[in-house]
């Protein structure tokens, strides 16, 4: 009998941390920031996030395809929540970062976490995010946990000393090419 109230409490708490559906249409305030997008199709918003200003969307699960929104990461803050500040400190955003520093910040963050065994920035080119000058870049990496080769495409900009970054990542085989058009359509709808 003592177990029944505990099970009821756990069942009631589950929806509070559940993933949620992102329906087509205007979606303001992504990653608790000025970012807004208009998805054409449905996405799933994952409840677990890597930080206060991070939001992750996926279609099939974050290991198969995911878009991460980093919204307004300010000076002195990291892209992701730090797990071990002493042994694995993450790089911090600087208000004076150049656009060309953004790919290196992402790579250094992934490497500092020990989450990747190999990573390379493959291309970099000027772009726009909304009306802002930005950098678009592609990268590839292999996670230490599953050794699956993944590809990524990202766009980032600095606004008033804060970083706005959107990344798309998926396994190189099949999923990256299958869903890249959905990411790019979402990217074209982004506003700051």
Label each residue range with its predicted role.
Residues 2-87, 105-107, 111-118, 126-132, ...:
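N-terminal targeting sequences that direct proteins away from the cytosol to non-cytosolic compartments
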Residues 136-138:
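Beta-strand secondary-structure signal
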């Amino acid at each position: 009998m003592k177990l029944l109230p505990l099970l009821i409490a756990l069942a009631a708490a589950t929806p509070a941390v559940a993933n949620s559906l992102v329906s087509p249409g205007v979606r303001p305030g992504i990653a608790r920031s000025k970012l807004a997008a208009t998805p054409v199709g449905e996405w799933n918003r994952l409840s677990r996030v890597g930080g206060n200003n991070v939001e992750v969307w996926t279609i099939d699960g974050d290991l198969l395809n995911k878009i991460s929104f980093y919204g307004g990461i300010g000076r002195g803050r990291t892209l992701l929540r730090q797990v071990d500040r002493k042994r694995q400190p993450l790089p911090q955003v600087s208000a004076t970062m150049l656009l060309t520093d953004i790919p290196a910040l992402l790579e250094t963050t992934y490497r500092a976490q020990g989450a990747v065994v190999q990573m390379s920035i493959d291309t970099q080119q000027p772009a726009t995010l909304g009306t802002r000058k930005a950098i678009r870049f592609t990268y590839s990496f292999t996670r230490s946990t599953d050794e699956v080769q993944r590809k990524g495409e990202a766009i980032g900009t600095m606004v008033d000393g804060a970083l706005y970054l959107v990344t798309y990542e998926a396994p190189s085989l099949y999923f990256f090419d299958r869903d890249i058009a959905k990411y790019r359509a979402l990217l074209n709808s982004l506003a700051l």
